[in-house]
Amino acid sequence: MARNREGLVLVLDVGPAMRSVLPDVEKACSMLLQKKLIYNKYDEVGIVVFGTEETGNELAREIGGYENVTVLRNIRVVDELAAEHVKQLPRGTVAGDFLDALIVGMDMLIKMYGNAHKGKKRMCLITNAACPTKDPFEGTKDDQVSTIAMKMAAEGIKMESIVMRSNLSGDAHERVIEENDHLLTLFSSNAIAKTVNVDSPLSLLGSLKTRRVAPVTLFRGDLEINPTMKIKVWVYKKVAEERLPTLKMYSDKAPPTDKFAKHEVKVDYDYKVTAESTEVIAPEERIKGFRYGPQVIPISPDQIETLKFKTDKGMKLLGFTEASNILRHYYMKDVNIVVPDPSKEKSVLAVSAIAREMKETNKVAIVRCVWRNGQGNVVVGVLTPNVSERDDTPDSFYFNVLPFAEDVREFPFPSFNKLPSSWKPDEQQQAVADNLVKMLDLAPSAEEEVLKPDLTPNPVLQRFYEYLELKSKSTDATLPPMDGTFKRLMEQDPELSSNNKSIMDTFRGSFEVKENPKLKKASKRLLRDKPSGSDDEDNRMITYDAKENKIDIVGDANPIQDFEAMISRRDKTDWTEKAITQMKNLIMKLVENCTDEGDKALECVLALRKGCVLEQEPKQFNEFLNHLFKLCQERNLSHLLEHFMSKKITLIPKSEAADSDIVDENAGDFIVKQESMLES
């Protein structure tokens, strides 16, 4: 086996207790082999099943025993036939012994590869571990498992145990399960093995690691605390997005008889002064240009190279800060893990000491990183301590890239904290929202968490692999319907929704959505004759469709509609200021030229007040209202003042806008004061 290839033996439980989940096991194993055909087509795979009535394995023929264990496929290069094998697993009729099956699988790997290629040999056990294992001829079961695990460790064989259980009950089952769980734990203690417990088809698909990615260091060098103290560290990728396989251009121009044709497509570009020109510009005559205002600035390759920031590779500690200062949305790219150089004992101790102190004091470290010599860019990141709970695993750090000022996006929105109480959910609405959140909790305290990232496969990738397999068999294959297992990722659990329909209905009824007529009806039909600051639903938050509101001036014809449209715009930050200023100017114009009761001016004042509350601009309205009343008094416009008083227009108090300097009592006193002045 080549150095970069893997030898894998699937050890599958097909006994009666697994019958209900075997279709899911077949699907998971089929997807594993499909990915190997794409990414690791030279890997070698063998298949062993246990729980069958018949026995078919080499150990049984050589020395006897190992009953009800069958080798479906000997270890050889993965192919389409292997994927078909796992889609048609036999349905066993007897309870199988997973220890016997593991010994058969281990024997296959040892005979195939010998003592070479350590770390490239793997067994994957899928079972519910609910059937009893046979007692050994000598010693205890613990001794037997320890012997098997030590042999696996000596041969460099890794093991994954995926335990899938559902609907198991009874004292006998519990005793057997407890014993088998203990035996599987012994494997983890004595060999390179891990056990994953799953309880759904979806988590089974995610638990079977279908693509093998070799750990490659991004960086090996010093973590510099100061010029005289440096710690040797290695940096690996911890979390990185898995993308679709690269689709390459394919040419069918090669003769069908040419077995060595590569079917490659090569693309060449020619650069010309004009499309009609026949003269091709040579590469040395081309130069890059960058726009700077209306002009294009030419910069040669030599100048670009000179501008590049070049520095020596390394990680330098800049300082420590409170973990709460680094917000979650600052994390920009893939997550790396920084581990001490395993060959340097002092590095392990130094990293452990720093990580544990950081965790105890709730601190994180800010570091400057250059991964390679001559790298064109420098990153600043945060180191978060990762204190290990296992004695055989050293402490480490998680590394996340942080943004620079140019990378941060700011979007201006009014703060919900400053909204008046009438626009916030009441106690009953808050209670039904709390119930909705509890109903949809993916990690209830008494149950296992649903949709764990480690056990949740990407449905887009799985869909692609499934379709690729179909196309390999028939070029006319159509895309099949979405698999029911993956629908649970794309849609809410229907059982959960149906069982909690009353909570859903209560929430929907508490937050009834009504059509807002303010953008469709004339302004005079919108405003009701009621006191400002009323808790009526007309005072609720108004939402606008920004695509329909491109008004940029408060006109005389429909001033209220224009005003509301302008303050709803979010394409620039100054629309609110412009709308308020223009509305104030219009009101002053209406008052100065008033020949009637001033209904239109009153409607505009009411609209201005609502807009200033919505945009949290109380000072602008309060100052304007005082100025407006003084103007009416100076010009003896008593009929206007009486009309305004009848509508109880008040200043905006703190209860409606947190930035206001007016308390609620003074807002009411304003009306009384104006009425007394009017009477005098």
UniProtKB/Swiss-Prot annotation:
InterPro entries: Ku70/Ku80_beta-barrel_dom, Ku80, Ku_C, Ku_C_sf, Ku_N, Ku_PK_bind, SPOC-like_C_dom_sf, vWFA_dom_sf. Heterodimer with KU70. Interacts with WEX. GO terms for molecular function: ATP binding; ATP hydrolysis activity; damaged DNA binding; DNA helicase activity; double-stranded DNA binding; telomeric DNA binding. The keyword ATP-binding applies. Keywords: ATP-binding, Cytoplasm, DNA damage, DNA recombination, DNA repair, DNA-binding, Helicase, Hydrolase, Nucleotide-binding, Nucleus. It is found in: Nucleus; Cytoplasm. Its main location: nucleus. It is an enzyme of class 3 (hydrolase). Single-stranded DNA-dependent ATP-dependent helicase. Involved in DNA non-homologous end joining (NHEJ) required for double-strand break repair. When associated with KU70, binds to double-stranded telomeric and non-telomeric DNA sequences, but not to single-stranded DNA. Plays a role in maintaining telomere length. Acts as a negative regulator of telomerase. Binds to and recombines double-stranded T-DNA molecules. One of its GO terms (biological process) is double-strand break repair via nonhomologous end joining. This is ATP-dependent DNA helicase 2 subunit KU80. It comes from the Eukaryota. It catalyses: ATP + H2O = ADP + phosphate + H(+). Residues 224-432 form the Ku domain. Its EC number is 3.6.4.12. GO terms for cellular component: cytoplasm; Ku70:Ku80 complex. Disruption phenotype: No visible phenotype when grown under normal conditions. Hypersensitivity to ionising radiation (IR) and to DNA-damaging agents. Longer telomeres. Defective in T-DNA integration. It holds the Pfam family Ku. Belongs to the ku80 family. Induction: Up-regulated in response to induction of double-strand breaks. Down-regulated by heat shock. Expressed ubiquitously.
